């Protein structure tokens, strides 16, 4: 299946392009109190090394806003301020931040939005219209309830509001906590505008539930060419958010980066400690950014076939096994020596590609 992405306008968050032909970026949000400068920077650095492109922070009051100014000066990543209720905080933060997210359901009057737009326009920073099914404006929830119809009305109303103020550096999110409703909301809005979309399932839950919901919703949308930046929302799991997001991009075939591990589910034919081997391989290869297919198989039934499609592979047997590279056997070793040799071949494969580039 050919992947064809919906062509959107391009905006810029710090040094990260979003929309157009830009790669789909991955975002996260800190769970520190923003006024905790040291703690916030520690989490930003963790996200940076995990492979995040953009970070969002909450701003509840002026103490947060002033701290955010200091955090921004030391951050290795572009920062977006997340504003609810108090538009004055957005106006203040626009002086130094890379982007603003507003919730149309609680930002207040048109005059409030006008002030935010003026500040962002002067700095040349974008605004995300963050529509959330749990906080729709009363004028739309009264008429449509808290479903997708109300979300669409809210999105189009607020898009027009910004456009009427001659502001077009816009991205949009349509988040619900339900995978099907999230898909429907983004699909129905996509033909109505050409602004870039920020994909996400809100309040998705802990690691297990978030991974399932986000994979269904975001994977579905990405395969339809919808989405320009994304976040996998996950309770208290910073690095895992990035890891799952990158895996969704890779396994949907949208973006190739990092290691794709093919491993068998195990059965009675296995005569080796495959589970331990896979855990070691996952841990030792998670730093690799180069797109790489590797195969870790527990017996010969499918191992050789999978190895033909892998860059580097292990085929375990009884007390011994094969290391295979691009379909060619490079070593036959005792089981205890297999993983180390396999990892050495993986690193050599990465180095050989870097040299060619």
Curated annotation (Swiss-Prot):
Binding residues for [4Fe-4S] cluster: 264, 267, 299, 306
Cofactor note: Binds 1 [4Fe-4S] cluster.
UniProtKB keywords: 4Fe-4S, Iron, Iron-sulfur, Isoprene biosynthesis, Metal-binding, Oxidoreductase
GO biological process per UniProt: isopentenyl diphosphate biosynthetic process, methylerythritol 4-phosphate pathway; terpenoid biosynthetic process
Listed EC numbers: 1.17.7.3
Domain of life: Bacteria
InterPro entries referenced in this protein's UniProt entry, alphabetically: Dihydropteroate_synth-like_sf (IPR011005), IspG_bac (IPR016425), IspG_bac-typ (IPR004588), NO2/SO3_Rdtase_4Fe4S_sf (IPR045854)
Class of the enzyme per the UniProt entry, highest EC level: oxidoreductase
Cofactors demanded by this protein: [4Fe-4S] cluster
Entry-linked NCBIfam families: ispG_gcpE, PRK00366.1
Protein family: Belongs to the IspG family.
Listed name of the protein: 4-hydroxy-3-methylbut-2-en-1-yl diphosphate synthase (flavodoxin)
Annotated organism of origin: Campylobacter jejuni subsp. jejuni serotype O:2 (strain ATCC 700819 / NCTC 11168)
């Amino acid at each position: 299946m050919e992947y064809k992405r919906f062509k959107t306008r391009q905006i810029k968050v710090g040094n990260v392009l979003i929309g157009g032909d830009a790669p789909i970026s991955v975002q996260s949000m800190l769970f520190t109190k923003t006024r905790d400068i040291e703690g916030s920077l520690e989490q930003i650095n963790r996200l940076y090394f995990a492979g995040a492109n953009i970070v969002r922070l909450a701003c509840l009051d002026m103490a947060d806003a002033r701290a955010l100014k200091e955090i921004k000066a030391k951050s290795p990543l572009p920062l977006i301020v997340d504003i609810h209720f108090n538009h004055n905080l957005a106006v203040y933060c626009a002086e130094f931040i890379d982007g603003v997210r507003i919730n149309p359901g609680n930002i207040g009057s048109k005059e409030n939005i006008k002030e935010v737009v003026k500040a962002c326009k002067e700095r040349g920073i974008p605004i995300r219209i963050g529509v959330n099914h749990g906080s729709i404006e009363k004028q739309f929830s009264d008429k449509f309830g808290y479903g997708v119809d109300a979300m669409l009305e809210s999105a189009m109303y607020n898009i027009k509001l910004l456009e009427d103020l001659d502001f077009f550096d816009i991205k949009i999110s349509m988040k619900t906590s339900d995978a099907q409703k999230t898909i429907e909301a983004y699909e129905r809005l996509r033909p109505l505008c050409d602004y870039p979309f920020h994909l996400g399932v809100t309040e998705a839950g802990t690691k297990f539930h978030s991974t399932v919901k986000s994979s269904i919703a975001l994977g579905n949308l990405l395969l339809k060419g919808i989405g320009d930046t994304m976040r996998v929302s996950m309770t208290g799991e910073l690095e895992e958010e990035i890891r799952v997001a990158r895996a969704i991009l890779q396994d949907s075939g949208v973006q190739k980066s990092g290691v794709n591990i093919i491993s068998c589910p195990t059965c009675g034919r296995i005569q080796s400690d495959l589970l331990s081997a896979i855990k070691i391989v996952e841990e030792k290869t998670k730093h690799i950014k180069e797109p790489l297919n590797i195969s870790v198989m527990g017996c010969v039934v499918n191992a050789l076939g999978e190895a033909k499609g892998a860059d580097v592979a292990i085929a375990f047997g009884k007390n011994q096994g094969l290391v295979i590279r691009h379909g060619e056997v490079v070593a036959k070793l005792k089981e205890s020596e297999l993983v180390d040799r396999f990892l050495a071949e993986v690193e050599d494969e990465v180095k050989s590609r870097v040299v060619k580039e």
